[in-house]
Amino acid sequence: FFGSVRFVYETGIKNRLMETGLTYTSTVVVSKENVAATMGSGDLNVFATPAMVALMENAAMNAVAGGLPEGSTTVGAMMNTTHIKPSAVGDTVSATAVLKEVEGRKLTFEVRAQDSKGVIGEGTHVRYIVDKEKFMSKLS
């Protein structure tokens, strides 16, 4: 996708380096557990859209996990995808996320999923860097 561009963001503790171009691919085999009929998103035994979105989020999370400050994580905030084609039970689906933009704590990714026949979905995903303790304290 794009060449690497370096950004530094302020964590409140110390500066960390986050580079565009960071990439990760997550893979899953289509099974009874992740088809639309089981997940409740449809009534066919094909790879479910929610499963594709989760795989894309997993790839984005892992793309930047190694560069986060201690005590931080990322949380998904926006997903804009199209699910172009179905994937059959037994096929392998891979989702790749590429970090495209860093704006402070906001991370924007290009995401794409494919199976053995080609691209099955693509889109844009936004995650935010958060402090785990502060984030979880919002539950109470």
Give the residues covered by each predicted segment.
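Hydrophobic beta-strand-centered segment that forms part of the acyl-chain substrate-binding groove
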Residues: 61-93
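Short, residue-level hotspots on alpha-helical faces of the histone-fold
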Residues: 54-58, 62
